Amino acid sequence: MSTQTTKILVFSHRPEVRETIITAVGRRPAPDLPRVDFVEAGAIADVLYEVDNGTVDLLILDGEAQPTGGMGLSRQLKDEITNCPPIVVAVRRKDDRWLATWSQADAVLVHPLDPLTAAETVADVLRRVPVVNG
């Protein structure tokens, strides 16, 4: 049995949004992938610290976070970080998916989160990239 894990950072200024995302994705988004360890970030500084240290395999950013939203943060990270980890942005409305595309996000989740869709989306993104934290 493998002891490898995948580290996912979940960013939102609201703890209940982070919890909703974590619950929807689950600790094992797919049987062929390692278990997930979640890191919660409530501030931009926390996200930047983890990304700068290269310790996360995937970021899930709340598009509605305040004062800086996940879409703007995604765009900044993709523009400024070499080998930026993949990013999934969670938006409130389906109509906001185009903004997530602008943000260079690798995938989009739409609230209310469906656990099957959330896990499948995250699994698809994780399958495209090597795990760096394991």
Cite the ranges covered by each PLM segment.
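Conserved acidic segment of CheY-like receiver
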Residues: T5-G26, L59
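C-terminal output helix
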Residues: T20, L113-V122
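Short hydrophobic/Thr-rich beta-strand motif most characteristic of the beta2 strand and flanking loop
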Residues: L33-G42
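Acidic, metal-coordinating helix/loop segments flanking the phosphotransfer/catalytic sites
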Residues: A41-L58
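Conserved phosphotransfer microenvironments
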Residues: D57-K78
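Two-component signal transduction core modules
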Residues: L59, V108-L109
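His-Asp phosphorelay/catalytic-motif detector in bacterial-type signaling
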Residues: I81-P86
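Alpha4 helix (beta4-alpha4-beta5 surface) of REC/receiver domains from two-component response regulators
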Residues: R92-V108
